[in-house]
């Protein structure tokens, strides 16, 4: 078994970021200014995702290209400075992108879901929890989430924050506890100098630690349509590395590139994850200050210890006042055995304690979540050490 195969042996949740140049490159004319979506490329991605799904892996896509495609559709020259024009192009291009993604995945019997994000998803805790829960639910139903920045309503300079979604993909990967982020573009990986201007540039196959020297290899953006140069990709790798997520930067032109990367083939540049840092978000949950206590019965305790979610039927009592998104202690027979991030407030839990999931709506008048605490939001105390 090769080193990469060992690294990726337990990879389960994968985020795939696809750059503008990859989605449109084969659909460009000789001027490289008028670009259309490349349906064949999208079908290739859909096929590879379907194969990963057969292996039991979860896949999320972060797709760029809305502005570039929209500009072409509206007959506007590339990279206009006026933000309203770019926002309009994003609105037109995004709908076209989703139509083509839906068409590509439908050929393999899969459905897709559009998720448009702004920077607030990262800074607002409740919004972040909603994102996690939404993506988790979509994956449970076999739907492929396709994420993009909401350029149409962005109040900051479009793409200035996320850099053609490089940073966005890293933030998504880190927040949903992905094991691997694959960044596909029109470049083979990270070189020690710009390969487009230096024929002797050397490809780095592995980066064990992102040092100032590694960051200096970033250079300036080189892609004509996208805004995500190597510098933003290195920053994305840095975010993921600290969250315990591997990153591979590779060329989307490689046949079955996603499948080859996931199987451990040495393609592109691999940035190692700092697995000892936040390897399991449960450590953070366990060390966080609890806002209250949820008492559960023995059956619920056994389910939680067995890596299952906490259901309202197993809740016996609630102590303290807390909101959705707060960390609470889980207690059984007078002993605290776990902590978790609750999806319901203390007031709501008091009303639905002991209630079966299908009765939540009858009690509250609504049912946002089937679980009180999702399994990925639980930390078992005995696992801290």
From Swiss-Prot:
Sequence ranges assigned to domain PUA in this UniProt record: 291-367
The reply to whether Signal figures as a keyword in the UniProt entry is no
* Binding positions for ATP per the UniProt entry: 17, 185-186
PROSITE patterns linked to this entry: GLUTAMATE_5_KINASE, PUA
List the keywords (alphabetical).
Amino-acid biosynthesis, ATP-binding, Cytoplasm, Kinase, Nucleotide-binding, Proline biosynthesis, Transferase
Q: Which domain of life is it from?
A: Archaea
EC number(s) per entry: 2.7.2.11
Recorded GO terms, molecular function?
ATP binding; glutamate 5-kinase activity; RNA binding
Pfam families registered for this protein in UniProt: AA_kinase, PUA
Q: Does the keyword ATP-binding apply?
A: yes
UniProt cross-references to PANTHER family, sorted A to Z: GLUTAMATE 5-KINASE
HAMAP family in the record = ProB
Q: What does this protein do?
A: Catalyzes the transfer of a phosphate group to glutamate to form L-glutamate 5-phosphate.
Q: What is this protein called?
A: Glutamate 5-kinase
Tell me what organism the protein belongs to.
Answer: Methanosarcina mazei (strain ATCC BAA-159 / DSM 3647 / Goe1 / Go1 / JCM 11833 / OCM 88)
Q: Tell me the name of the encoding gene.
A: proB
């Amino acid at each position: 078994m090769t080193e990469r195969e060992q690294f990726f042996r337990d990879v389960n949740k994968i985020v795939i970021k696809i750059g503008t140049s990859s989605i449109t490159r084969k659909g460009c004319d000789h001027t490289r200014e008028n670009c259309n979506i490349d349906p064949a490329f999208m079908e290739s991605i859909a096929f590879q995702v379907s194969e990963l799904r057969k292996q039991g892996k979860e896949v999320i896509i972060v797709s760029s290209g809305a502005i570039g495609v929209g500009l072409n559709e509206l007959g506007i020259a590339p990279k206009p400075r006026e933000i309203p024009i770019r926002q309009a192009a994003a609105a037109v291009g995004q709908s076209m992108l989703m139509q083509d993604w839906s068409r590509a995945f439908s050929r393999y019997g899969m459905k897709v879901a559009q998720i448009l994000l702004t920077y607030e998803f990262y800074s607002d805790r409740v919004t972040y929890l909603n994102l996690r829960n939404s993506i988790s639910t979509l994956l449970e139903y076999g739907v492929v989430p396709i994420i993009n920045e909401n350029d149409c309503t962005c109040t900051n300079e479009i793409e200035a924050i996320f850099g053609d979604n490089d940073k966005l993909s890293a933030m998504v990967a880190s927040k949903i506890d992905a094991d691997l982020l694959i960044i596909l573009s029109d470049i083979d990986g990270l070189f020690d100098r710009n390969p487009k201007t230096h024929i002797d540039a050397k490809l780095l196959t592995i980066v064990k630690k992102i040092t100032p020297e590694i960051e200096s290899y970033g250079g300036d953006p080189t892609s004509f349509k996208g805004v995500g140069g190597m510098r933003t990709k290195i920053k994305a790798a840095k975010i993921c590395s600290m969250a315990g997520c591997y990153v591979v930067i590779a060329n989307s032109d490689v046949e079955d590139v996603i499948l080859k990367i996931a199987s451990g083939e040495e393609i592109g540049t691999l940035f190692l994850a700092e697995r000892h840092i936040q390897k399991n978000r449960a450590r953070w949950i366990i060390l966080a200050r609890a806002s209250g206590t949820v008492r559960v019965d023995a059956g619920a305790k056994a389910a939680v210890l067995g890596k299952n979610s906490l259901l309202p039927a197993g809740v016996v009592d609630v102590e303290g006042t807390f909101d959705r998104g707060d960390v609470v202690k889980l207690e059984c027979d007078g002993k605290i055995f776990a902590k978790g991030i609750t999806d319901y407030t203390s007031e709501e839990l008091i009303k639905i304690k002991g209630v079966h999931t299908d009765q939540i709506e009858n009690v509250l008048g609504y049912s946002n979540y089937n679980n009180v605490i999702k399994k990925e939001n639980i930390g078992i105390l005995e696992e801290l050490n």
